[in-house]
Amino acid sequence: SSTSSTSSTSSISPAREIVLSGINLGTYGRDLTPRIAFLDLLRRILDETSLERLRLSSIEPQDVTQDLVDLFASADRIAQHFHMPLQSASDRILAAMHRWYRSAHYARRLDLIHDRLPHAAIGADVIAGFPGETESDHAATVAFIERHPFTYLHVFSYSPRPGTKAAAAPHQVPAATIKQRARELRSLSDSKSSAFRRSQIGRTLRVLTLHRDARSISEHTGAEYTPALSTNYLRVQIPGIFPSNQWQDVAITSQEGNYLCGQILESDPPPLCESSAYSASLRYP
C-alpha cells in the first residue's frame, strides 16, 4: 500500500553522493538519436537535480577533455577524482592489448588534470605480466608511474581467460615473475598514496561521513572515530561518533596509516556522543 511504502522510506536519508558508474562512461549518448554528449549529461545532472556530490567511477583517458576538466574545476558538486585505466605504459603492450591510446596521450591527460586541479585524486588500473611483457616493458610502466601525479593504483596480476587471444598468445610471463612485478607496483602505489595524503596536511577537506562498525576504534588511543570520505577520495577519521551521510569540515593535521587526521571546524549535526578517549585538541589517529 502507499501507506506502508511511505513509512518504509520516510526514515531513509537521501543520498548526498552518487557514483556514476558504467563501462566506457565517456561514450554515453553516442548511440542515441539525437546524439547526447557525456558532458551534457553531467551538466544536466548538476542543473536539474539537487545532488550534493557526483563522483565518476572511471573514465577512459581519450574521454578526458579540456571541457570535462574545466567542468570539474568549476563545479564543486563534482568529486575531484579521476580514475583512468592505464594497464601499461609500454606502447608495445598497449598495442597488443588493443588499447586506443599510447603513453604520451595518457601523459597529456594527466598534465591536463593536474595543472587545473592539483589536489585531485588520480587513480589507474595496471596489469602486471600481460603476455609478451618484458622487463623493459615493466620498467617503462614503473618509470611512467613514478614521474606522474598518480595518487593510487589498482594493480591486477594477469591470468589467462579461456578463449581469449591473450590466453593463446606466445611469450606468457611466468607466474613468479608476474607476482614479483605486481608486488613492485603495489609498493609504488603505497608510496604514491602516502605522498598524496601528506600533501593534504594543512588543508581543510569537506568530507562525507560513512557507516561506522566495530573496527572504528583507534589502534593508538582507543578513541572511537567515524570514517569519512573527501572529494579527492581520501579516507579521513573524525573523532567521536557521528551519523553517516553528514558533511564535516576537517582541518587536516596528520597522516596515520591509510587515514588522514585533523580537527573538526564545523559539526552538522553534533556528535551522537563523545568517546571517553576523545582528546580535547580533536586530534586523532
Residue ranges and their predicted role:
Residues 14-136:
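Conserved SAM/AdoMet-binding glycine-rich loop
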Residues 1, 11-28, 82, 104-115, ...:
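Proteins enriched for Cys/Gly/acidic motifs involved in redox and nucleic-acid/cofactor modification
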Residues 168-285:
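Terminal RNA-binding accessory module
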Residues 20, 56, 84, 125, ...:
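Conserved, mostly hydrophobic/aromatic
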Residues 28-46, 50, 96-97, 160-191:
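Radical SAM enzyme [4Fe-4S]-AdoMet core and its adjacent flexible, acidic
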Residues 133, 148-150:
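Contiguous mid-protein beta-loop-alpha structural module that forms a pocket-lining wall or clamp
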Residues 3-12, 276-283:
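Short, low-complexity, charge-dense intrinsically disordered segments
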